[in-house]
Amino acid sequence: MTKDMTTGSITPLLVNFTIPLVLGNLFQLTYNAVDSIIVGKFVGEDALAAVGTSNPQKTLAILFINGMCLGAGILVSTAFGAGDNKLVERQVSTTAIAGTVFSLAFSLVCILLANPLLRLLQVPEEILPIAVNYLRIVFAGLIFTFFYNFLAATMRALGDSKSALYFLMVSSVLNIAGDLFFVEVLGWGSEGCALSTVLSEAACCALCLVYIRWKIPVLQLGRRWLVFDSSLLKKTVSYGWASAMQQATVQLGKIAVQAIVNTMGVNAMAAFTASSRIDDFAYIPQQNIGHAATTLMAQNRGAGKKDRVRKGFFCGLKIEAVYAVCITILCYFCAEPIIRLFADQPEVVELGVRFLRLVSLFYLMPALTNGVQGGFRGLGDLKITLNSSMLNMAGRVAAAAVFVLILHMDIEALPYSYAVGWVLMLLYEVPALVRCLKDGTL
């Protein structure tokens, strides 16, 4: 199933496309949260801290791969909007081949570097072996991560955001069931949790391939899956690399912040892990609203419909703002019962509540930055998204280092450092946006 987003009322199109993306990520975040709950309740605080301190490295690898898929998806959207199905086919097959080779090599490198990377980040010795084993199992399954993200990004580029949601829901249920079986029944601890993640992603890939074979004619390539168009590779790598680096830059900043948190003790680490799981409910849906606007804008850019490109951008910003207000209210007033889902120790709960309430007050800023970034991706200008993300992370890490390591502030230093990064990001993005509006690019 595909959806032409170059015709029809823009607001319903964007809302209907956005809802499955947001639901999919909320569902994924829910099972990630359940993941942490199962580890925390059935294995213990050390295992929860180990999984939490491993999560930024795992997410870095996943987001780097996802960024490549997102960049390639922009090219697919543009070709589909222009009505060039042959170009769509060649773009998809070329990305699949190049991505497979890269993912296998990347997986091997990540497995080899898991231990030295965690040591570099000052992970405490008592949880280091747990964290290393968890990461290596997850990294071994990166080929499944690539194929799911690639197929899902391609379906979204063609206007189908619902199918990926259904497959993700099935995968999430399988992951939770696997967690309970491997962790509670077999007693495999955090390693069982990691294995469940890999197996559920493999199942999700299989479901996507079966669906594409039966329901999406433009992707029924058969032997044409083996077609490699070297003329498309340079642009694909350019878009994919810029998008991957933007995603990776954000995660590298989070890893640097995690390293600073690791100096604050196990209680702060556990509180930060629990709070960050909930914090993701704000950021990731905001990113997906931006991705929805990117798809609509890219399709209409390919079709040469500049007026719809502009309207799609501003509609995306409105949706971002509404979501930010809703999640701010929820996280601020329900902080304590939410944190208690992850931990029982009073010290951990108290630190987590303080973090979550403070950071929720700033949620409107990332909503605006994600909306603007979605717009620039839709225009094909990935350099601005990369530069602004680098500025954001540099400001965040520098502020966190000053607040924690020099001024010796406690966990509340982290939300303030986030705000510093977002302010710098807006100071860079807003003038660039104004220039695009004035010169007619947008």
Question: Each PLM stretch: what is its role?
Answer:
Residues M1-T18, V76-G141, V185-W241, M297-F362, ...:
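Short alpha-helical transmembrane segments in multi-pass integral membrane proteins
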Residues N16-D35, I137, Y148, S171, ...:
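Transmembrane helical elements of multi-pass membrane transporters/channels
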Residues L48-L108, T145-A164, A271-A335, P366-G380, ...:
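Small-residue-rich hydrophobic transmembrane alpha-helices
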